[in-house]
Amino acid sequence: MSLFAGRPIKRLSLLARGGVGLAVAEFLASRRGLEVVSYQATDLAPRLRRLFPRAKAVKDPTTAAYAAHLRRDADCVFSAHCAVVLPPRVLDATPHPINLHPGYLPWGRGYWPTYWAIADRSPAGCTLHRMVALVDKGEIIARKRVPVLPTDDGQTLTARVAKAEAVLVREMWADLASGRYPTFRPREKGTYHDRAEGLSARRLKGSTRMTARQFTDLARAFTDTRFDGMSVDGVYLRLSLHEAKK
């Protein structure tokens, strides 16, 4: 464990998406002494415009122009479910490149960490970490474990992890804002899954060989009413999970 010591975070650029991104944005809007100077123009753009009327909307946070904006105007770039991998020129433009990740790092690096926590039977949770060029490999600031219940599917676990993410940001904000916060590198190897692996795992062939437990874990991991879920030979399925009556 070490202490990262940089200048206080008084001006912040927010890259936020989805429900967790909105929760983070609303929390940051309530912080005295913090100015959100820009935000990514994602699905949240109309709401972020109302929360931060003086901030500029950024279409592409990978450009040299955005990096120059950060060097000039921001102490921190804060990512909350941003779907873009930021290049080194952006990560190096502020002393505090911070990401909120819906996985208990080093497990769940990459795409769909809550789903893979079920499929892999690996730890689930959320993590605040410093961003580096390698995806989800930066030093960990703080993390919060979320138990995987026997009746969880991908959607229910994702919802509980989202609540934990909002709590983690609130708990750690005073340290982050001061510019002085603990960091550490995990000793465990953890897991990584890219997008292609997730898409492939959701499209099984009838000839695929696996145990009943592996099939059940994979099916419930990708059970989520927000998309089609897992399929076998083109037939989609979702599991309905409940504990046995005693």
Task: Say what each PLM segment does.
Residues 1-246:
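One-carbon transfer enzymes
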